[in-house]
Amino acid sequence: MRCPFCGYEDSKVVDTRPTNEGKTIKRRRECLKCQKRFTTYEKIEKQPILVIKKDNRREEFDRNKILNGIIKACQKRPVSIEQMNKIVDEIENEIYNSMREEISSREIGEMVMEKLKKIDEISYVRFASVYRQFKDINTFIEELQKLLTEKIE
């Protein structure tokens, strides 16, 4: 690893620690020439996953799009940013662990709704109304009736 201070090509690892729930390795290094220490991070390079949109276009997976949709659905609701990030992390992990190269936006939307439903039903209905493109009040009522039926069972 090249030293950021003097540019020397060689360094030794002084300390290694897992971070970010084991997804990243933090290494303290020492330059063999100038003896200055610096930190590097190592993480697994993820293969790009393509999202198949409704019109069959393909876009690279972007976790920020999911997070932004969840933030809008949870606006003025008692859902913390930590909970929202956890939902996105879980979905991202499920997608990458599936070892698929492509996933439909429909599948991602269903995953988001499933997780939102467990945390906050109002946020779930808000997300569903945009995602499923509710046309009128009857569509809202149908979705609410489904929720009530699930709650009773």
From Swiss-Prot:
GO terms, molecular function: ATP binding; DNA binding; zinc ion binding
PROSITE patterns xrefs: ATP_CONE (PS51161)
GO biological process, one term: negative regulation of DNA-templated transcription
Cofactor remark: Binds 1 zinc ion.
Annotated ranges, domain ATP-cone: 49-139
Cofactor(s) recorded in Swiss-Prot or TrEMBL: Zn(2+)
Family according to the record: Belongs to the NrdR family.
Protein name: Transcriptional repressor NrdR
Organism field: Caldicellulosiruptor bescii (strain ATCC BAA-1888 / DSM 6725 / KCTC 15123 / Z-1320)
Gene: nrdR
